[in-house]
């Protein structure tokens, strides 16, 4: 237990002496006060939703329609655009009002959650078990804990189905692969084949396989949400109506801190997946809104110079580069025709502006000579100058690259931030899992505070 250093610091039964935790231990003081812990969680949800609403309106207020979203440091409007709000052909923003509505709805929701959080933190009952037994719980009540797990799963499943309904019945979603450079379309034939959907999970995460990050069409994305939403709803019902089996009761640690550690591990995994998805995937994260991926920017540069030099009379099929390999085109390890030069490392890149120029044997020479469309040239030139090179605390671009635009790509920011957050959540998982296991084993004594510097410091008040 924590050592008391200021006996006057008492707050409604949540003082250090009665709980074993000091004020800075936060919600640990509320482990046995279900009503107050509810208040803390509802208030936390209110803060999250407030940020979403406020940041949403901030982005709307600063949005410049003439510039691409990814050049303006936006991270919320690209998501709203991806699910089909306010955009038209080619990802052009045609109406910002839906974005404004989204921000206002989130702000209103945050006010409701904020009121509920303050109410339960200050006014509501300290514990729920007596007044509202349905919402009350004991951490060691295994049946109640799995019931709560089930309720959470059902809510997550409904969330997945909301995207499905939006894609199928409420205006559709933005599909970067729509002919002519992307458009909003209704998904009429989502993939429901378990072989396809679960095939992604069985793929290798390495190389060109890419696990679930390799998804490259909206039908599979929406079909995946049908599967995950349905499984979560049925899994939730299962956990509500059943009791944990004997092996599960023995295998898990059943305490508040253990559940915290499980949750942190789950969020950590989701953070790492989001990191990879936002960095590599240009279907769930359309390049029109989030900017090109690294391989995409590289391939688009090779394509842009191929177009330029071909117009100047170069024979792009036979020109040699300084290494003796093809300057513009060469063969991949599997015999396909690919772009030559440094971008050969990204030979398995797939993008909606490039795929029309392929045939069964890679890039089609006849199409490259006769079929390149103006929108493909414009898209490639734009992506070439917007490689995702910035980091969390830097400007973008390369100092020696005269074609680079100085900006920080949302892909850089989202990938870097989610990796960092995923890592810290994983460390939090290890910390709380270790404490929970030690407490369950009976040798958790806490940290020795006898010689802690804070003991000799002046009290806060």
From Swiss-Prot:
Regions that span the bilayer: 57-81, 122-143, 166-188, 243-263, 279-300, 435-459
Residues reported to bind [CaMn4O5] cluster: 355
Bilayer disposition of the protein: Multi-pass membrane protein
Subcellular localization(s) per the UniProt record: Plastid, Chloroplast thylakoid membrane
GO-annotated molecular function: chlorophyll binding; electron transporter, transferring electrons within the cyclic electron transport pathway of photosynthesis activity; metal ion binding
GO cellular component, one term: chloroplast thylakoid membrane
Keyword Cytoplasm recorded: no
UniProtKB keywords: Acetylation, Chlorophyll, Chloroplast, Chromophore, Manganese, Membrane, Metal-binding, Phosphoprotein, Photosynthesis, Photosystem II, Plastid, Thylakoid, Transmembrane, Transmembrane helix
Classification via InterPro entries: PS_antenna-like, PS_II_antenna-like_sf, PSII_PsbC, PSII_PsbC_sf
Propeptide cleavage-removed residue intervals: 1-2
Residues modified to Phosphothreonine: 3
Cofactor remark from the record: Binds multiple chlorophylls and provides some of the ligands for the Ca-4Mn-5O cluster of the oxygen-evolving complex. It may also provide a ligand for a Cl- that is required for oxygen evolution. PSII binds additional chlorophylls, carotenoids and specific lipids.
Gene Ontology biological-process entries: photosynthetic electron transport in photosystem II
Modified residues (N-acetylthreonine): 3
Ranges in coiled-coil conformation: none
NCBIfam families: psbC
Function recorded in the entry: One of the components of the core complex of photosystem II (PSII). It binds chlorophyll and helps catalyze the primary light-induced photochemical processes of PSII. PSII is a light-driven water:plastoquinone oxidoreductase, using light energy to abstract electrons from H(2)O, generating O(2) and a proton gradient subsequently used for ATP formation.
Assembly and oligomerization: PSII is composed of 1 copy each of membrane proteins PsbA, PsbB, PsbC, PsbD, PsbE, PsbF, PsbH, PsbI, PsbJ, PsbK, PsbL, PsbM, PsbT, PsbX, PsbY, PsbZ, Psb30/Ycf12, at least 3 peripheral proteins of the oxygen-evolving complex and a large number of cofactors. It forms dimeric complexes.
Protein name listed in UniProt: Photosystem II CP43 reaction center protein
Gene from which this protein is expressed: psbC
